[in-house]
């Protein structure tokens, strides 16, 4: 599961608070159904092995969270889409999906990017050297200790016997289907402004949507077994 450049959702409620643990941390995850909502309670601890944190690219340690997420139980596809950054969904183990980073091109910053950089050029974590300390699950840890996925949660999907891996904030199911690729592709040539140089995937703006009838849509969604 990997999203490029544009992520769209229509509803997301999140509350998390870091909790210090003095015992072994175990995954806790529950799903409850309300009239029109599907709600998730989680401590944010994955049910699979993780990389070592802190590490060279990420100074944060994993800590238990208090996560409460509700999404529409009966989602409807809208005629309009909303571009967002940040958390876009939750996996079926209670770990959150957050593909985008908080970094933007900043030639004055030591690393060449910062939270206060040029908003026209947002950093793609998979194009960065060191990938900000991502582990083998394409995940790392935020400042508050929240372990979260930026791409395909390898350790999680390897233990599944189904394609359904989670829910997006708009209520639609998230599936991992082997061989299915995003329709966002890398541009040819060189950037004409901003961080001059070849389009190399360092920034989300290095990609464009190349759609066709056999590819998923601009929101990385599509039909699967009769459902969007």
PLM region spans:
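A mature extracytoplasmic/lumenal domain signature
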Residues: 75, 101-103, 151-153, 178-180
């Amino acid at each position: 599961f990997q999203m490029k450049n544009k992520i769209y959702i229509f509803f997301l409620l999140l509350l998390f608070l870091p909790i210090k643990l003095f015992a072994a941390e175990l995954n806790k995850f529950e799903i409850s159904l309300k009239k029109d909502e599907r709600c998730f309670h989680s401590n944010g601890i994955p049910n699979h092995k993780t990389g070592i944190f802190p590490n060279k690219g990420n100074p944060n340690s994993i800590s238990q969270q208090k996560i409460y997420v509700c999404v529409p139980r009966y989602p409807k596809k809208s005629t309009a889409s909303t571009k967002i950054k940040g958390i876009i969904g939750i996996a079926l183990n209670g770990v959150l999906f957050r593909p985008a980073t908080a970094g933007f091109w900043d030639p004055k910053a030591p690393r060449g990017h910062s939270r206060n950089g040029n908003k026209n050029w947002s950093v793609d974590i998979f194009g960065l050297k060191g990938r900000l300390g991502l582990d083998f699950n394409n995940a790392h840890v935020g400042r508050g200790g929240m372990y979260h996925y930026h791409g395909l949660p390898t350790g999680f999907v390897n233990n599944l016997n189904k394609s359904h891996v989670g829910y997006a904030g708009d209520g639609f199911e998230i599936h991992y289907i082997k061989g299915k690729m995003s329709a966002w592709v890398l541009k040819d040539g060189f950037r004409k402004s901003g961080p001059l140089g070849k389009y190399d995937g360092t920034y989300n703006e290095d990609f464009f949507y190349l759609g066709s009838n056999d590819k998923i849509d601009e929101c990385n969604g599509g039909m699967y077994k009769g459902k969007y």
